[in-house]
Each structure stands twice: as structure tokens, then as C-alpha cells.
């Protein structure tokens, strides 16, 4: 079967890149939008898996199979979690992207380019210090950080020598959480990216003068490094439908959405455009709405909340309110379903149109699945997807549910007023989304907000917290009100993010005791997973 790429793209718009394509032509988001935008999100993830990417690829295949023009947009996987604990991010079963081993491990080198450009900025800043140039950069007032696309906890806190008499305390972020990745994904075009990176605050001088990237005189070098990376990539599903894959910020420590450049391309090409926001709706979807939609004036016509029977039972069993182990399967579903209700209400409070897709596992118990379907149908329109096992031809009900659920978007009820002060915005996010009761701040967080108050008046809030619970605590599986403590504050001036860091959340992940890197086996004759 040949791929459907030329159904949507002219050959002159594309350039071959190994087994993939890059889109050379730049697109703007249409002023009169005719495409329908569908956002795919989920409940809080569990070790059982939710299949959000699988569901997105499945819906895209379904829409194409039954005669609609549809393109999906996805984030590029990071090698950090791929070699860490999470593994790849290319779907599975009959909803897996072609060439997953290539996509998961380096792909078209976009992450390397972002990493190199990001680190060039830091290297030049320190070079200015080494040669004591006229910029007179204060070594203790550098805002920018290095990044690398590998989980490495030893890089969370480092001390190193810049010159004979100057040492610096700093840290690395993982590339997916870097300042440059966020800008890469929110920029509307190459020219927009160039303008915004030039005017990004990176340090202060010894006389407290602001130092911007343009002061370093390296903007042409940055754009040279990122020339190919800023072109979105095309990959294909098993049904040979095109998927635009571009950018890859994490949702728990960044904003968790693929690039605006990719969305712009899709919205110019197809009747339906699907996109995914990372982790549960309290992270990726919230940031998609409060950050990306504000940046682009887009509003999704439909939000798909992905759930699974296994995940809901996991949330039920691990609910912190349980006084004794649960043995009744329906009771596990009843208690775990509170997580679904929480995410559904969060999305409805934003004034979004929501349907639920139950991603069916092949070994799910039919009676339990029917029980879950009935509970979910009391909330909103619900459908069971068997895309993983059966593919598009046997999922007409999924196609029909998606088509019937798409509506004209309504005005968004924003979580916070962008013009409000930083503390009020963080408090609104904490109470309305994370179920916070009392919000407190460490002395460090308070001091950073005070020091930056003149710079962050119209900044977005991009929370950094655990993805495994609606709250800020890993072990907290229920949805009760709880106290929230802001440990630290990071500022990303490239995209105007205030990043409140809750509990023990790190911008550089670590590896587990037995990382996934030890488990990967490759047949080198065919370069395929064993």
C-alpha cells in the first residue's frame, strides 16, 4: 500500500529526509478557519497505559478510512524517557507509526539541533565572561541553562569554572523542558522564531542591565543550526496516513504540545486536524488551552478524553482514601472513576466540548467494560475503540461518534486572567485545576517572584508537577482538596512562562534502577526491534 502523502501535499512542498519527509513550505493559521481541530487528552497515566497516542493515530486512520480528510499532529519522542522508564511514544498495535525505532531514537535530528543552538547561547555567554567583554555579564545572574536529551540526574546541580577566578553554579534541563524547545513549539514561523529568540532575556550585567540574545551577535548561527529543524516532519501510520511530527516539550515540566508550525500546516491541508497534549488533562490539555490557544486564537471543536478499564481500576485500587484493599471489581471502577469525573469537569469548566473514548485492551472483561461504558455515557457521549486490535475497518462507531461530537467552539473560560499578578495566577491554577485548598510558597519561590515582578506581568503559568495524580503528590490518587506548596519558580523569558515547581519535580529527570536502555534489543541485520 502506498502512503497518502500526495493526497495532501505537492511534491514541491516536500524534501526527503531519510525514511521521512520535511515540509519546506511555511503556512499561517488560516484567518477563516474551516478545519475542525480535535484535541486528544487523557486521565492521569498509570503503569497500565492509557493509549493516548494510539487513540489519536486510530481516530486519524478511522477518519481517513471512512472518507474524511484528516491529518494528525504529534510531538517527537524524547530519548530521555525512551531510554529511561516510559519507553517510546509512537503508538502500538495497528496504531503504530512506521519506523518506530528511528522515530524514537533521534528521528530527523531536530532535538540535536535544538540542543546545540540552546547550548551555543550558554557557551557564548560564558565566553563573554571569560574575555571580560563590554557586556560585563554577571556570572551570578545568568538566566539561560544548558540542555541535553538524556535523563541524567547528576546534571541537576553543577559547579564549574568559567575563568581562572570565576566559578558558576548551574544545571541542565532535559531538552524537552528547555527554554528553546518551548519557543520552537510556540513560534508561528521561522521569522517569528528569529524575532522572539533575538529578544529573549538571558542574563544581567554587573550594573543590572538586561542582556538579550541579540546582544551576543549569534542570531545567524542559531538560525543556521535550526534551519532544517524548523521544518515540520512527516511520518506515516500503519494505514499510511500522514502524521506531522514536530517539537516535543514535556507536559509535566513544559507546555506539552507539538509545534504551532505543525498545526498551521495541518490546518491548511485537511478537513480534520488531530493533536495531542501530554499526560492528563490537568497538564497538557490545560496548557494547550491557557497557553497555546491564547497564542494562536485557536479553540478545539472537540476534546477526546481517553480512558481505559485497566487505568481506572488502578486509580481505584491506589486511592489514598481506601481503608482496606479492594476486592470487588466494580468497586475498583467506581472509585477509580472519580479520576475520570475530575478530568471531565476540568475540561467542561474551560467551556470545552468533550467526548470519551474507552481504549479497549484485548483482555478486558466484557461485563466490566460494559459497566464502565454505562458510567461514562452518563457523563457524555462515549465510544469503545478497538483500533489497537482491529484497525479502522471495524471501528465505524468510533468514526461516527467523533463526527457527531464535533461542534462549533464556544468562548473559552480561562483558568486565570493573564493580566493578573503572578501569585493570583498561580493560585487560580492550583485551586481550579490541581484541587488546591491552601497555597503556600517557599522563601525561595517568593524571592524569585519578587525579583522578577517587573518582567513577568503578562506571563503565562506553566506548572511543573507530577503527572500521576490530579494533585501535586505522586501517591495521591484521589481528587480531594489538599494543601499545595510551591517549592521554586523558574522563568522562561523566551515564551513568557512563569514555571511554579511543585513538590519534588525536576527539570532534569533521572534514570530508574533498571532503565529501558538495558531492555532494548535490536536485530542489526534488519535494524528492527526484536
From Swiss-Prot:
Its EC number is 6.3.4.3. PROSITE patterns: FTHFS_1. ATP binds at residues 46-53. GO terms for molecular function: ATP binding; formate-tetrahydrofolate ligase activity. GO terms for biological process: tetrahydrofolate interconversion. InterPro entries: Formate_THF_ligase, Formate_THF_ligase_CS, P-loop_NTPase. Gene3D superfamilies: Domain 2, N(10)-formyltetrahydrofolate synthetase, Formyltetrahydrofolate synthetase, domain 3, P-loop containing nucleotide triphosphate hydrolases. Pathway: One-carbon metabolism; tetrahydrofolate interconversion. It is an enzyme of class 6 (ligase). It comes from the Bacteria. Keywords: ATP-binding, Ligase, Nucleotide-binding, One-carbon metabolism. It catalyses: (6S)-5,6,7,8-tetrahydrofolate + formate + ATP = (6R)-10-formyltetrahydrofolate + ADP + phosphate. HAMAP family: FTHFS. Belongs to the formate--tetrahydrofolate ligase family. This is Formate--tetrahydrofolate ligase. It comes from Malacoplasma penetrans (strain HF-2).
